């Protein structure tokens, strides 16, 4: 089994976390262990390569709330990131991959919500849904056979901001979070440990090195 490095960024703004992700990508390209970065972001809207300015359906609300809109190089459309949502960046060499990367991540998200007795469904696009409402999102980029970007899983986050976008290019896409589905107060730290366990099992890793980096509340 391969070793998996874990980097927990706590809460970090999107740009700063992206810098860490790209630094880790360079390290993995040079031979470092595959790495899973976990983070929460302050409110931000990101638009992937499949999205455009038309992904924003209520720009006045976004401006009023002071929410940054950032175009990224990942796949997919527009997605909201905010506190109470677990974001993960698996930085992995595809040449060593035992299974399809996107499918493995989607299946891991399903494994995680199943721990809380929540049954999820898959759709035509990467992600998971619960009773027709999207709860897990996946958007990746591959550079020199190394993956970047990754997934987001709604845990206890405010869902109002999703109404201002076409989530993943789908008009009027309903969304939900794990707290709404379980009526439980879910610890983010506990959720991270569950995800690490399920991810490691899916991809045949041994979590080996845990690195905690100090986050920032900057937008």
Give each language-model segment a name.
Residues 11, 140, 180:
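Active-site donor-binding loop signature of nucleotide-sugar glycosyltransferases
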Residues 88-90, 126, 138-140, 151-155, ...:
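A structural signal for short, well-ordered beta-strand segments
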Residues 160-219:
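C-terminal accessory segment of soluble enzyme catalytic cores
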Residues 53-57, 135-156:
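Short, conserved beta-strand/beta-arch hydrophobic-aromatic motifs that form part
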Residues 50, 100, 140, 163-165:
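A short secondary-structure junction signal
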Residues 1-129, 134-135, 185-186, 214-219:
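N-terminal lobe of the biotin/lipoate ligase/transferase fold
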């Amino acid at each position: 089994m391969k070793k998996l490095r874990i980097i927990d960024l706590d809460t970090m703004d999107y740009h700063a976390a992206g810098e860490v992700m790209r630094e880790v990508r360079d390290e993995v390209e040079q031979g470092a262990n595959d790495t899973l970065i976990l983070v929460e972001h302050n409110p931000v809207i990101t638009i992937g390569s499949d999205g455009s300015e038309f992904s924003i359906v209520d720009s006045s609300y976004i401006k009023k709330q002071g929410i940054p809109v950032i175009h990224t190089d990942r796949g997919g459309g527009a997605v909201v990131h905010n506190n109470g949502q677990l974001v993960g960046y698996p930085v992995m060499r595809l040449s060593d991959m035992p299974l399809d990367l996107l499918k493995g991540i989607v299946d891991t998200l399903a494994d995680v919500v199943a721990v809380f007795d929540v049954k999820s469904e898959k759709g035509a696009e990467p992600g998971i849904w619960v009773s027709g409402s999207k709860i897990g999102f996946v958007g990746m980029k591959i550079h020199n056979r190394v993956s970047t970007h990754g997934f987001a899983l709604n845990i206890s986050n405010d869902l109002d901001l999703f109404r201002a976008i076409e989530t993943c290019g789908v008009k009027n896409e309903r969304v939900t979070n794990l707290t709404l589905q379980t009526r439980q107060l879910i610890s983010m730290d506990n959720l991270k440990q569950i995800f690490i366990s399920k991810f490691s099992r899916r991809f045949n890793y041994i979590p080996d090195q845990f690195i905690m980096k100090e986050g920032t509340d900057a937008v």
